[in-house]
């Protein structure tokens, strides 16, 4: 992480008293941050550390300090999620042979565990930033490599979408999430203030942004956070931009932003932990159902097309990750096959959903995400997912799970959709739920919702 560390050193010299971190009620200047990193380096130097060191801490401030201190010691941080169940932590430590884990009580060293990632293996991945994990929505989270050059390329295109007066970046999610860690390093590398939270709280986040009168804030959020924020938002002049990522923004949120925060610069990103950014929609210039236009340094193709021209999205760019741990390296000139299906029409990218979410009903491919987006345009539906359950005649049938104040009939849903989708795309059954359950990254937990529905718990 040579470039980002040098940039941080420059900011410490040129503006030592500027606020680098504003986490909850704590503010830390660039000079103070440097001193705390130096202190952490001195503490960690007492130990014989292995090449990869896991960080599993509840405190964002301590996590940031440890992350940067490990880089000064030329170690690779592995960012773990503090909210994972202890069984998941143990399984991951065992699977990847992690011998050193920095937790809330200090450094824990597993001397007896076999080391899976060693210095020889890391030679194939120069200039690593960290080892991260996918969201793990369908199983055990998967470890991947992220190098510095890829995020420096992302910073460059991201900067083009920032407003000139934005001097602070807020990302209230956990640092183990790619979006939050990205926003942190983007802020520190560019000499801005990073605003974060231990636990997302919309009112407290707005209060943080108001606390320093000079703040002009760009917020990096997932759609569920934007939805919560709009419930307490009231002409917040310190907030300049919403950068939304992690899932498609529903049209209902677009409408709320237009009504409540029309002066906000709204940028919707589409990307993944592995690919980083793929496309963007600036201030709704793209059709609302699309995820915008490709970034200039991204190439895209689709393969394995169905009869509707929908295919698997493949990406090539200099913002790509370096590969999964234990698998082959990924180079910038190689095509990476995503788990997303979609198509490009008139330069705009449209997503039809993840491959594992696709339903096959009577031999027809059904992409729930497309129908779900249409359904959330109804004022009666807040959120919606369509799950597939086994059916003897058709193989599967679609079941709509939706939240909202209005209880709908199947006839209501059929009437709303009949001119928008094909007949076989209309869910066969509907079920109203009091609330949706979410993954740690803010997406609807489809697997959990389906399991609960099948067990009669919704």
Swiss-Prot record:
Enzyme superclass (EC): ligase
The EC number(s) this enzyme carries: 6.2.1.-
UniProt keyword annotation of Ligase present: yes
Keywords for the protein's UniProt record, in alphabetical order: Fatty acid metabolism, Ligase, Lipid metabolism
InterPro entries: AMP-bd_C, AMP-bd_C_sf, AMP-binding_CS, AMP-dep_synth/lig_dom, ANL_N_sf
Gene3D superfamilies: 3.30.300.30, N-terminal domain of ligase-like
GO term, biological process aspect, one: fatty acid metabolic process
UniProt-recorded Gene Ontology molecular function terms: medium-chain fatty acid-CoA ligase activity
Keyword Lipid metabolism in annotation: yes
Family: Belongs to the ATP-dependent AMP-binding enzyme family.
Database matches in PANTHER family: ACYL-COA SYNTHETASE, MEDIUM-CHAIN ACYL-COA LIGASE ACSF2, MITOCHONDRIAL
Further details from the record: May contribute to vancomycin resistance.
Name of the protein described by the UniProt record: Putative long chain fatty acid-CoA ligase VraA
